[in-house]
């Protein structure tokens, strides 16, 4: 299965039980910041934004004072899982980033999708990739 298929079929799909509700953007990005696959709507990000995200996985709390920046958008960092998941909020939407052994699984949402639904979609794929040694 191609990385693009994972994005299209497992991240940009309808949320279970909520037909028509889906993430607004998603991507799988290598730890080095290289894009493995992304939706057409995923924002163009700067290398320093990805570096900040990777630093926060290695040093939890690093982004808390400044916020998480991706594609020029600033998200307030909210409760995540140290070293495993970073969550951010901006207005009625937000972002979830799950770290696997080799990649970051990223999902961005807006209402009517809830933070919990975004977490479920992103973390389910991230957990699967971890189980596969990726």
From Swiss-Prot:
Occurs in many kinds of cells as a complex with monomeric actin in a 1:1 ratio. Binds to actin and affects the structure of the cytoskeleton. At high concentrations, profilin prevents the polymerization of actin, whereas it enhances it at low concentrations. The keyword Disulfide bond applies. This is Profilin-2. It comes from Olea europaea. One of its GO terms (cellular component) is cytoskeleton. Belongs to the profilin family. Phosphorylated by MAP kinases. One of its GO terms (molecular function) is actin monomer binding. The variability of the residues taking part of IgE-binding epitopes might be responsible of the difference in cross-reactivity among olive pollen cultivars, and between distantly related pollen species, leading to a variable range of allergy reactions among atopic patients. The modification Phosphothreonine is found at residue 114. Pfam families: Profilin. It is found in: Cytoplasm, Cytoskeleton. Disulfide bonds join 13-118. A motif (Involved in PIP2 interaction) lies at residues 84-100. Keywords: Actin-binding, Allergen, Cytoplasm, Cytoskeleton, Disulfide bond, Phosphoprotein.
């Amino acid at each position: 299965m191609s990385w693009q298929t994972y994005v299209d079929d497992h991240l940009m799909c309808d949320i279970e039980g909520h037909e028509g509700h889906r993430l607004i953007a998603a991507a799988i990005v290598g730890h080095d910041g290289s894009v493995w696959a992304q939706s057409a709507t995923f924002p163009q990000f700067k290398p320093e934004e990805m570096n900040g995200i990777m630093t926060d996985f290695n040093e939890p709390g690093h982004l808390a004072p400044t916020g998480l920046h991706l594609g020029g958008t600033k998200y307030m960092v909210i409760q995540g899982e140290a070293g495993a998941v970073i969550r951010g909020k901006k207005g009625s939407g937000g972002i979830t980033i799950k770290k696997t052994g080799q990649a970051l699984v990223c999902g961005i949402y807006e209402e009517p999708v809830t933070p919990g639904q975004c977490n479920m979609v992103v973390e389910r794929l991230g957990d699967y990739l971890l189980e596969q040694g990726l």
